[in-house]
Regions:
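Hydrophobic membrane-insertion alpha-helices, especially the h-region
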Residues: 11-26
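Generic structural signal for small/hydrophobic residues in well-ordered secondary structure
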Residues: 25, 116, 157, 173, ...
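Helix-to-loop transition at the C-terminal end of transmembrane segments
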Residues: 26-38
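Histidine-centered active-site loop/cap adjacent to the catalytic His
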Residues: 28, 247, 317-354
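Membrane/wall-proximal cationic-aromatic binding patches
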Residues: 36-137, 305, 313-316, 320-324
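Conserved SGNH/GDSL esterase-like catalytic core that processes O-acyl groups on lipids
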Residues: 86, 110-112, 118-199
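Solvent-exposed, polar/charged alpha-helical surfaces in well-ordered, non-transmembrane soluble domains
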Residues: 132, 136, 159, 163, ...
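Serine-dependent acyl-ester chemistry module
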Residues: 178-311, 315-326
Length: 354
């Protein structure tokens, strides 16, 4: 008999806790069930309070985008390190500490760059991505805004121009072409129907507030490693973005960029390193069809090897122009990209009425 009272008290406490949690879950479901998914994602984002300083993982430097075909974008106001290199983003959520007015200053030639991790500057520090080098080389009349984000494909880049960059009144657009412009985005947003009756709003909220911050992603995004996700959720997520994969999607995106830029008389440069093979030829054809300039930087890279009396083979190329064990352009490669772009851009700018 004496044992029954403590057991009863413990049971009562546990039941009360269960009912409180159940009530909280029901309340969250009732409130957010009739609202947009982005509303709950915003609450999770505030609860998560992801760091903006210190050593940042890839999942901590991006956030879900409000535009479906952009999918995700850089978080504004970052001031830390990424892959051991300094990283800053400004109020627009683009790489670099320099702030740009939304209204273009008089007498300014404004350039926007669209690309993935190569343009973003994966593995190099502040001042070292080629668009930052280019801006410095061109001088004070020029602004170069880097909208490059790791893992972007061609459709995302054009959507970024349409919904984010076009309103900044650019005079020139640079698109960095590489082979994965035809592939799936690095991160995906979860399908809106993914939150089922078995999925807990309360658990997500607690995870966002108290869970590990190590390499986590924005609440509106699925983790890059999707192997641990439910197979049906993976299938739905991939299906949601099937329209932006493959050569037809790329060609459609380039045609859309052509429509948007021709209407305002804005020239477009497609920057590539080589641009041969099936994918490169497709990019060349898309550029020609839309009146873009296809700029192959590889002759300058080859000339550098000649100047340094180095062999022209794959291993020498990799060790000279790539980050070790990574494959992304190193500081030297970014310098050469900037050099290649500078001459072409000065020629275009001279034809502009200031």
């Amino acid at each position: 008999m004496p044992l029954r009272k403590p057991l009863f008290a413990t049971g009562a406490v546990l039941l009360s806790m269960f009912l409180a949690l159940l009530l909280a879950e029901v309340g969250l479901r009732v409130y957010f069930g009739s609202r947009e998914p982005a509303d709950f994602a915003a609450v999770l984002r505030r609860a998560r309070n992801a760091p903006r300083t210190g050593a940042l993982a890839l999942g901590q430097i991006v956030q879900a985008s409000a535009w479906p075909d952009i999918v995700y974008e850089l978080r504004p106001g970052l001031d830390g390190t990424f892959r051991g290199q300094t990283l800053r983003t400004n109020a627009l959520g683009i790489r670099g500490a320099r702030e740009y007015a939304r209204e273009k200053p008089a007498g300014t030639f404004r350039i926007v760059g669209l690309g993935d991790s190569n343009m973003f500057g994966w593995g190099v520090g502040e001042g070292e991505p080629y668009l930052q080098i280019l801006e410095k080389r061109l001088g004070p009349r020029f602004e170069v805004l880097n909208f490059g984000v790791p893992g972007y494909n061609g459709v995302m880049e054009v959507s970024t121009y349409e919904h984010r960059a076009a309103e900044l009144a650019p005079d020139l657009v640079i698109v960095h072409f590489i082979g994965n412009d035809f592939g799936l985005p690095h991160f995906l947003q979860a399908p809106e129907e993914a939150r089922s009756l078995l999925h807990s709003y309360l658990w997500e909220l607690l995870q966002a507030r108290f869970g590990s911050k190590e390499d986590e992603v924005d609440p509106g995004l699925l983790p890059h490693d999707r192997s641990q996700l439910d197979p049906e959720l993976r299938r739905q997520a991939r299906g949601r973005y099937a329209h932006m994969m493959g050569k037809d999607a790329y060609l459609k995106a380039m045609n859309r960029l052509g429509e948007l830029t021709r209407a305002r008389g804005i020239p477009v440069i497609i920057l590539s390193l080589g641009g041969s093979g099936e994918q490169g030829n497709l990019a060349r054809q898309a550029a020609a069809a839309n009146g873009f300039t296809f700029l192959d930087a590889s002759p300058r890279f080859y000339r550098y090897l000649v100047e340094q009396r180095m062999r022209d083979d794959r291993e020498v190329w990799r060790s000279t122009f790539r980050i070790p064990h990574d494959g992304h352009p190193n500081r030297l490669a970014h310098e050469l990209y900037a050099e290649v772009l500078e001459g072409t851009i000065r020629s275009l700018a001279e034809r502009r009425t200031w």
